[in-house]
């Protein structure tokens, strides 16, 4: 089953695994919870879980074949404390909030912020994996970030032996997100905050 466009083994390690685990060099993930939105083949959450067994992982993805793959993978490599949800982030219950919410290659930041920040605990973090060309997205997302109760805490640029510089945009949740968010996806896409 092909869940990623990158198939050369060395490139998979660099562009998926190393990129995914960089978050663990920035934060202590022990005994924390993470929601991975649109995880696809399980990046960044599965490598982070392998690295940090006490990390409580929840993955949501809109394609059932991806969720089925991740379920099979989790069973084969004996991953525990992992919840797999077939669905859309904006339709997920807000009963549970997370220490971290992550997303890689899901949407532009002004849309992604509304999908992610409602599920971050106060004083928790939304971490967006982006390329070095993040500035335009960041500029257009400033209003959304503010309305959803977060601030940009830091921008971390890093290289992983590829031709690209990667970036973690780290947003800290400083107040609760208004309960009207996230809106339905059609509205988020048509009228981003």
Q: Where would I find each of the regions flagged by the language model?
A:
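SAM/dcSAM-binding transferase cores
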Residues: 139-193
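Conserved SAM-binding motif I beta-strand of class I
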Residues: 56-61
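A short acidic, Gly/Pro-enriched loop at the edge of an enzyme's catalytic core
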Residues: 90-100
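Short alpha-helix immediately C-terminal to the canonical SAM-binding loop
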Residues: 66-68, 134, 138
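Class I SAM-dependent transferase core
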Residues: 1-31, 35, 65-82
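Helix-to-beta-strand junctions that scaffold the AdoMet/dcAdoMet cofactor pocket
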Residues: 120-122
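Conserved SAM-binding loop of SAM-dependent methyltransferases across substrates and taxa
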Residues: 41-54
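A short SAM/SAH-binding and catalytic strip from SAM-dependent methyltransferases
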Residues: 99-113, 118, 132
């Amino acid at each position: 089953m092909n869940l990623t466009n990158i198939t050369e083994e060395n490139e998979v390690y660099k562009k998926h695994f190393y990129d995914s685990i960089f978050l663990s060099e920035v934060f202590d993930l022990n005994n924390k919870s993470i929601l991975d939105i649109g995880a696809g083949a399980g990046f960044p959450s599965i490598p982070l879980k392998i690295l940090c067994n006490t990390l409580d992982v929840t993955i949501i993805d809109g394609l059932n074949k991806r969720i089925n793959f991740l379920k099979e993978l989790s069973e084969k490599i004996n991953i525990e404390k992992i919840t797999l949800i077939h669905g859309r982030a904006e339709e997920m219950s807000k009963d549970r909030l997370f220490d971290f919410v992550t997303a890689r290659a899901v949407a532009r930041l002004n849309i992604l912020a509304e999908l992610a920040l409602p599920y971050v605990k106060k004083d928790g973090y939304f971490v967006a994996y982006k390329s070095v060309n993040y500035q335009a997205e960041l500029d257009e997302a400033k209003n959304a970030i503010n309305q959803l109760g977060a601030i940009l805490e830091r921008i971390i640029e890093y290289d992983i032996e590829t031709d690209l510089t990667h970036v973690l945009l780290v947003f800290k949740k400083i107040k609760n997100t208004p309960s009207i968010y996230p809106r339905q996806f059609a509205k988020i896409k048509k009228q981003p905050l």
